[in-house]
Amino acid sequence: MNNKWDFDDENDRLVAYLPSFTYNDSVKLKEDINNAVRGKRIVYTLSEHTGALKDLGFSVEAETSGFFEGEKAIILTQYDKEERKNSKTKTENEEVLNRVREDSKQISQPCLYPVGLVQDRDLKSLAALYKKVFPKYPTNIFDPEALKKAAESDYLFAAVKNGGEVIAAASAMKTGYRSAEITDCAVKPDYRGNQLLHYLVLDLEEECRKEGINHIFSITRARSTGMNMTVKRLGYQYEGTLINNCIITSGFEDMNVWSQALK
């Protein structure tokens, strides 16, 4: 498994995926800590490397089961900016989780609209949906050409359409470690309450199975009752909250990690 580094200036963070943690990785991380000021550093790694990262000032914030080809990823973080370290919505986050945990509803009715993978002809409508739903977002989902490039590389986009218009969408971002993240979830306001994301996630799970992906996870806005409820009802397990993780809607927001094995 290869290590990957993402210097994400847009979200004032470094995200590193380190299934191995060599001397060179340690030096690279130390140099970044000593020479750069970042709001947040995030490292996904295996459990045997957590001690070395804690020695560098990192602490465990969450985990995601099966991330590294079936092995659990421990998510450790380190902050240079105190305001980034402290949640602004801790009480609200806990209230959302409590509501979600108490829910026992099962979704059984069929979807009212067709669900399927996005085609090139859908990209303008997909971008228009994202512009309508999100004033801010951590990646460029507002440009049809950027969406096309994503779909040609590591992303599977699925959509619910009505009369040719994309009214709900989500994607699965392939990690390269036989796991994938459910992300970019949006529903046009007029169509909310129809459980459309439920069917989108099911569709993406099936597409991931076809590609040999064994584990799937979602990093979900901690304040969003709807999306947390969606993945919980689909059998995902809560595995922690990432504080002020990325810019979305209202600025930096806390994100919940949910995961499950694909059977």
What are the functions of these language-model segments?
Residues A36-S47, C208-T220:
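Conserved GNAT acetyl-CoA-binding A-motif
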Residues V43-T45, S59-I74, Q237-F252:
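Conserved catalytic-core motifs of GNAT/GCN5-like acyltransferases
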Residues D12-N24, C185-G193, T220-R221:
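A short, internal acetyl-CoA/4′-phosphopantetheine-binding micro-motif in the GNAT/acyltransferase core
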Residues T22-N34, V187, G193-K210, M229, ...:
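Conserved acetyl-CoA-binding loop-helix of GNAT-fold acetyltransferases
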Residues A52-F58, T230-K232:
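Conserved active-site tyrosine of GNAT-family acetyltransferases
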Residues C111-L126:
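A short beta-loop-alpha structural element at the N-terminal edge
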Residues N2-R13, S125-P189:
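A conserved beta-strand-loop-helix scaffold within acyl/acetyltransferase catalytic domains
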Residues M1-V37, T50-G51, E83:
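N-terminal charged segments
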